[in-house]
C-alpha cells in the first residue's frame, strides 16, 4: 500500500502486520503505543471495524479527537437484500471519507480537486522503456481479476476482448495471484501487442505506468481506482456488485460502467463485496458480450487524448 502515498511530502506511512508484530489485542496496544509517540492530534477512522474501534477507544482515553466513517451499513443491506430491495444509489465512498475529515475540522471539496502530476520517468527507467515501445498506439491497461468469482468476467470472454483490442492498441495486463500471473503470461505469449506488467514491475513501477496509459479496463477492483486517481478513463465491468454500492472509481461517470442486465438478474447487487452468487446466477456474467466491452472501450478511447506522448 505504501507506494500509493509516496507523492505526499507531509505524510508518514506506518506499515502494520496484524498476523505477526501486531497480532491480537496485545498487538493493538503495541500499535497504539507506537502511534501515540507520533504526537497525533486527531484520528480519522476510515475503516470502522473491530480493530480500529479498539484503537479509537485507546485514543479517546487519552483525549485525542476521533471521528469514524459512516459506511451506511443499513442502506447497504437494503440495497443487496433479495426481497424488498431498495434499489437506489448509496453515497460514494469518497464523500464518506470527506465527511470524516470534515468532522475533524479539515473540510475537503472534491468538486475542486486536482489530479496528481504524472511521475517523471527517466529515459533509462524500465517504465519509460516499456512505454516508449507503444509508438503512436494508445495503451489500454486491463486488470481482468478481482478478489471474488462474482466480480470476475469469464476468462474466455475476456480473451476475446484482449484479442480484438490488441490488433490496433497496446495492451498492458495487471494482476497479482499465482494463477492470475500464469494466465497473464498465456495471453502475453499468444498476442503480439500484449505485455505482462504484473510479473515484471513492482507496485511503485506499476502505478507509474498506470498514470500514463490511455484507458483502464477493470473489474470492481483496486487497479481501476488507482487509474482513476490519475485521471485515467476507467471502464468498469460489474458482476454481482453494482455502481450503486458506492465504489465507482473516482470521477468516472455511470457511462463508463458495464453492468449485468437487472431485468434478467434482479437480485444484483447481491452483496457489496461480490462474494455472493445466488442459485441461477452462476452464468450471469456471460450475458455481458465481449462486443459490448469492446465497443465501449473504443468509444471511451476515441474521446480520450493520448497520455503517454
Residue ranges of predicted features:
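Catalytic machinery of carbohydrate-active enzymes
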Residues: 1-309
